[in-house]
Amino acid sequence: MKDQLLVPLRRRPWTCQKCLQRLQLPRHQTRRSFETAASPFPRPLDSLPADYARTKTVDDDTLRRVFDSQQFWREFSQQRAAQPKPTGLVQNQYLTSPDGFRTFANVSLQKCQAIVSKVLAASTLEEYRTMARDLDRLSDLLCRVIDLSDFIRVIHPDPQVQEAATQAYALMFEYMNVLNTTTGLNDQLKKAAANPEVTSQWSDEEKIVAQILIKDFSNSAIHMPPHERQRFVNLSNDISQLGSSFVNGAEPAKSHVSVATNNLRGLDPILVQQIKRWNRTAAVPTTGMIPRLALRSVHDENVRREVYLASRTSSKRQLHRLEELLLKRAELAKLSGYESFAHMTLSDKMAKSPEAVSNFLTALVESNRKLVREELSQLQVMKGAPLQPWDHAYYVHQRVLQYSQARRSRELSAVPEFFSLGTVMQGLSRLFDRLYGVRLVPQEPAPGETWNPDVRRLDVVDEAGRHIAVIYCDLFSRPNKHPNPAHFTLRCSREISAEEVAECASLDQSSHPNDGMATAVDPVTQTLRQLPTIALVCDFPEPGTNGGGRPSLLSEHSVRTLFHEMGHAVHSILGQTRLQSISGTRCATDFAELPSVLMEHFATVPSVLALYARHWRTDEPLSEGMIRSMERDRTAHGSIYGAVENEAQILMALVDQAYHSRPADGGRIDSTALYQQVSQQHSSLPEPADATTPPTSWQGFFGHLYGYGATYYSYIFDRAIANKLWVDVFGAGRHAVDRAAGERYKNEVLRWGGGRSGWECVAGALGSANESNADGRLVEGGDQAMREVGRWGLGRDGVSG
């Protein structure tokens, strides 16, 4: 975390870990209502508006048009323009003006303080029995302000709103820091969790949330004596500052290499002119796009070697930052009673230990090695001599050019014509309807509800017409907008107790138990629920402005990106737990990417393409010939470099583990020696190790060592699991639109959020008859389970994103 308010702690008890890692982008929300006889409110909390009676066919057509036609969107979005009273941002009743952020934060703060007083004063069995739920509500109240303010302060175009959101964010983080040092909360929760008369009355969710909070308190040093706690805070501050400096301070040892211009043959002449100097030499920079292009295109191997070595050698200052960061993390782990930082970080993950991660990565290296050798042997034939690391990009580029000239179908250039943004969103809705019985319904935003006129609002409804979630889609590019695609949960699902409803009604007739945002009544329990509210942010080109204008057309890569982000969204939508601390994507870090990675597999299989891939002008479906051409193209590119890309990701995960698994009392670290050791031991194209070549130190450019310290393996771990589920549950695409397969995946994985072990989810989805899970051996996880996942491999698709 970069924000100074976060520096005292590695992970806060009162906010979702995902939220704390996302200081750079937004998330979103809505509301609805069913009228109930017992409702104390002057307006219904969950009545669906009349326009929900629109047929699925009309909704489906509207979904495509709101994204593909600016004129249609303008008309559609103005239907509530005459509403006399503006709605707050994302329907939050407080956020009708910048000043509303202060009110929102203060009201939430008062509710938090009341809960803290209640927990600290608890003395009876009944009071202890409500403690897990009380503390979950405390977490929810903090996240309500923090998540939304964090999003708005980055995404909103108005500086006044940005500043107001920043102040609300700061206020709640400051209060959260107070909670983190309130030892009575930890003492009371541990007392409750240790009493069988209390825990016997807790649901499984309450038990899980209590254990999560106890561990979070422990990781925040609340149990330590004052002097050790202060040391913990100081170390956390140091780590935050060093981490920020490391991420932002990446720099090479040399800013450029001097090369004779006539040795740059193959590089674009325009680029050569840009870097040319007066004395027939060129200064090739060692960072940015030019060195990457040089490695791909310069014919002279000696030049490629020089550029490769210089662009992978970090400055001494940057290496010092990294090694200080690793040292402080090791000291923090020792202070917390752990063998290493990796042991501390992994204790609540699926992996559990660095030894298990090592088992997974080692098995993965072996399962991938044959494919790597096949790829490299083809490149070595092209070179006619032993392949070196600086040769790989060059000969891959040559092979791709050969393939493109000889076999690549010209019709592939027309594929984006069949992927308008509207048709892709339509396809996602149809896919979700077939797999899970939920669909996306465009909804006219109320005045003041969105932060930009281009933001589309979608309501998610089930087959009974019940409203279950809200998605705000901010998908088009605009000046100063963050370009990276992302999913944000602005408000998690959660059950709202009758006591909260009564408390809210007693405060103010206009007050709402979910701040005016989306609610619904659970048809089974008849309890009120706050619905997940999500924001999807992308950077696609805007559609044409006139009525017949060209829509935003997506590349195959962009389609996969959108499917990936919607994989996170569907986890939030379907993972509706009673407690917010474990809802949706609030699960173990090494499980969180599974739904999104699995969704990528659906994007281009024929049965799913048949749901949406139609020409934006003629409505002609994508032909079987074009689909086969796409498949051949993916297979060809995967066979050229997919396995080597996978190996590169595995090596980065191994380096991460090597750095963070060192014993806490292991003294100073030589990060370059460890990096070289991993490369020599596991790489098929290891870094040069001869005495005449100074060792490279690419680790100084590996910024994820800070944000994903000891957990960089997570993405490829989830890729391996996703590949397995794709084959064994969805039949490698044969059952991609099959309801039985969708229900199985939903019931075993998605609906649990973080309320079930990831291993139980995977084992449940595979079933006990699956050879990999014979006798349910995956359920408990452990070293052997991690090794088994490593044997599943990554295929040849390469790493997307």
From Swiss-Prot:
Gene Ontology CC terms, in alphabetical order: mitochondrial matrix; mitochondrion
Protease keyword on record: yes
Pfam families the record matches: Peptidase_M3
Domain of life of the organism encoding this protein: Eukaryota
InterPro entries according to UniProt: M3A_MIP (IPR033851), MetalloPept_cat_dom_sf (IPR024079), Neurolysin/TOP_dom2 (IPR024077), Pept_M3A_M3B (IPR045090), Pept_M3A_M3B_dom (IPR001567)
Coiled-coil spans in chain: none
Main subcellular location: mitochondrion
Classification via PROSITE patterns: ZINC_PROTEASE
Enzyme class: hydrolase
Cofactor binding note of this UniProt entry: Binds 1 zinc ion.
Described purpose of this protein according to its UniProt entry: Cleaves proteins, imported into the mitochondrion, to their mature size. While most mitochondrial precursor proteins are processed to the mature form in one step by mitochondrial processing peptidase (MPP), the sequential cleavage by MIP of an octapeptide after initial processing by MPP is a required step for a subgroup of nuclear-encoded precursor proteins destined for the matrix or the inner membrane.
Family that this chain belongs to: Belongs to the peptidase M3 family.
Protein name, entry field: Mitochondrial intermediate peptidase
